[in-house]
């Protein structure tokens, strides 16, 4: 609950600071002088409500969406010794991390992957792929589970929802300012909002959305390093490195994880350079090297 309260407080603070900053720099006067009659404070609040609403809804239904999109089967009563071991391992790691036991599931995929999601660190879901269970050693699976428990314990789902809400707000806000500026100043439209407003707003949202995604993915990559550190603390550095090395060997296999879930999986990060700016995970070799430096 404290994380949700922090979420709301941070959102309000962002809107307040942005509104004050725009006023101090005379942005309202600049827009009015150029024929754009906008109440920027009201527009900012409007964009914040819709921007954060989307990320909040996604956060609260994340477990349901994950189960539906991946076909995850929750283990309520273990039927095999592998399922029994999986439940016991997650319970042990959760206790060490100081969180409540999450739901545990298996999703039908050949690639080795796992994910954690949920709106609350004490109401989460941790799932692993069938391929990971079949091909990884118990120590490697335990390290992967420790990484996912690290995500839950660090509150990464709430953090990324917060970041996404902030960037959603400013993408909507500045796209509409650009749309109004193009419509009123460049095309001199004085009768409501013309076609130029809608075209410019859509184009601006696309461009700003790409830039915003880079910010969100940067935060996501930082959280992966932290989850690796948590995994190393819970399962041992050598086991965590071994699991990442094994994932690197399997990177050529096709990935069937839905795009909406890739940011919460353990496997990813194949691209470097500009393409790497839009990746949710750092390259595996970088993650392995970071753990080696950590010792």
Curated annotation (Swiss-Prot):
The EC number(s) this enzyme carries: 3.4.24.-
InterPro entries according to UniProt: HtpX_protease (IPR050083), Pept_M48_protease_HtpX (IPR022919), Peptidase_M48 (IPR001915)
One Pfam family of this chain: Peptidase_M48
GO molecular function: metalloendopeptidase activity; zinc ion binding
Transmembrane feature ranges: 4-24, 41-61, 158-178, 199-219
Active site positions: 148
Protein name listed in UniProt: Protease HtpX
Originating gene: htpX
